[in-house]
């Protein structure tokens, strides 16, 4: 991983355009090729980013500024102009073992992948633990019409889980091979506040019956 602290300005050119004026920021270049720009006023979400596969080309013009051009397979560009570099270091972090889920959550994921029709008629599994630049989506599936659906699975559904799925959806919908991607928030219990937030963001909620998925007596699950 490469960490750069620099005064920089950033332009995104793609289906939409955006501009970040000059400020002091942290730039992360990860081993998977992803590039993200961070400020000091948010816990985790970058100001802008480019997901892999993407390619970084670094050039120096007539001025002392350094230009990074990050291009993805769709031809979208993240243009980062570094006016002053204060820190530039690289570290080899090695292979990460990944997040070890709570036993029930891990089993719920496994069971829902095996019984993906629980999500609705005609649903098919694409992959468990579908990797993104910010972590793995529990399940990536397709609905009966072939549209992509990201599924986040929790034992107890709270606002943090909805926020997590929202971040995944923002990222996945930037991939033209997957977009449009909708979301399903699945849990054994979903708090009312989380359900309200999910509905407001167009995310479907699914209350799971763990015993039913395990094939025991109960056959109840509810859609909201």
Swiss-Prot record:
Keyword Protease: no
InterPro entries, A to Z: Endonuclease_NucS, NucS_C, NucS_N, NucS_N_sf, tRNA_endonuc-like_dom_sf
Highest taxon of source: Bacteria
Membrane-spanning intervals of the chain: none
EC number: 3.1.-.-
Top EC class for this record: hydrolase
Pfam families cross-referenced by the UniProt entry: NucS_C, NucS_N
GO molecular function: DNA binding; single-stranded DNA endodeoxyribonuclease activity
Principal cellular location given in the protein's record: cytoplasm
Functional note: Cleaves both 3' and 5' ssDNA extremities of branched DNA structures.
HAMAP family the UniProt entry points to: NucS
NCBIfam families the record matches: PRK03298.1
Protein name: Endonuclease NucS
Organism: Rhodococcus erythropolis (strain PR4 / NBRC 100887)
Lineage: Bacteria, Bacillati, Actinomycetota, Actinomycetes, Mycobacteriales
């Amino acid at each position: 991983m490469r960490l750069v602290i620099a005064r920089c300005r950033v332009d995104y050119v793609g289906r939409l355009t955006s501009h970040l004026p000059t400020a002091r920021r942290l730039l992360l270049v990860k081993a998977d090729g992803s590039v993200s720009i961070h400020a000091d006023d948010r816990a985790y979400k970058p100001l802008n980013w480019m997901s892999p596969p993407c390619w970084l080309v670094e050039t120096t013009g007539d001025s002392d500024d350094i230009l990074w051009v990050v291009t993805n397979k769709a031809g979208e560009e993240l243009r980062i102009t570094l006016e002053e570099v204060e820190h530039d270091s690289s570290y080899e972090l090695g292979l990460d073992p990944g997040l070890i889920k709570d036993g029930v959550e891990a089993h719920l994921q496994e069971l829902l992948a095996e019984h993906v029709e629980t999500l609705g008629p005609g649903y098919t599994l694409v992959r468990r633990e579908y990797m993104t630049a910010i972590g793995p989506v529990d399940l990536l599936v397709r609905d009966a019409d072939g549209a992509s659906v990201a599924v986040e699975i929790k034992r107890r559904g709270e606002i943090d889980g909805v926020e997590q799925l929202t971040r995944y959806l923002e990222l996945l919908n930037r991939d033209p091979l997957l977009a449009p991607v909708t979301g399903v928030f699945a849990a054994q219990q979903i708090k009312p506040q989380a359900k309200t937030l999910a509905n407001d963001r167009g995310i479907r909620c699914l209350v799971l019956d763990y015993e039913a998925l395990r094939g025991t007596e109960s056959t109840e699950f509810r859609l909201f």
